[in-house]
């Protein structure tokens, strides 16, 4: 049996999306995901200004009381392709799976599954990094950190937060948490928020708790996970060092083109075409990430300056 396989649309979705769910951001359910974006996705931004006044008969409606905007999330389209020699895989399969002949121009079908699974797993890691750190340049998405840095509405160092002016460690991690939570606006404090940190910040806080004789912020109940005050802390390996981000899940959206027919995963046995003994892999996919309300995102990137 040839190893040629083709997956398109929803079939590709089931492969790539499941792999992506193994990474922190999707595994923990930190952001909203729209898997079937064709090209663009409108993120709604609705702001109502209250016009509360003393009661009198009649109506005097305020003008411009509702401000409605839409942020357009445009998918970037990418591809990943490579060619490998089937001969490199032959020693890893048994004679039974290869067939009775000592030489067989067809490889077992599970080689295709192995290639797809391994590549999808690596693409999931790539997506995780792009969600947070993509620079928006050729071959990259525009990641959230890049967007936060350029957005004057996002609450950050110099814009609503007085930075601690140093890399975060055991000695100052509590100060960093204090600075981030104190900067939360009322509209964010009253919501269920995600309090996420980079691995180095999580390590610093864990060391602080250990030195203070506490398992976590609740003073020893290890079943609750790591907490700070009333906030549960979650570690996201894709975040750059010295990072703290606080936001509501529904405010940030990842759009994927995995469910439309333009996206695909293909593995082609080139022996069927040019007798080269090679296998060609190609996947085509789209993605973009963005948010509706920058004023409801707290981002603290603490550095030595």
Residue ranges, per PLM feature:
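Acidic/polar, low-complexity extended loops/arms that serve as protein-protein interfaces
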Residues: 15-95, 125
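Ordered core of a single globular domain
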Residues: 175-212
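Short coil/turn segments at secondary-structure boundaries
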Residues: 131-136, 190-198, 218-221
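Sequence/fold signature of self-assembling virion shell proteins
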Residues: 2-52, 103-106, 146-171, 203-305
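Alpha-helical scaffold segments that mediate packing/assembly in large oligomeric complexes
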Residues: 95-182, 300-305
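Internal mixed-charge
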Residues: 124, 128, 199, 239
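Solvent-exposed loop and beta-edge segments used for protein-protein assembly and interaction
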Residues: 74, 187-189, 275
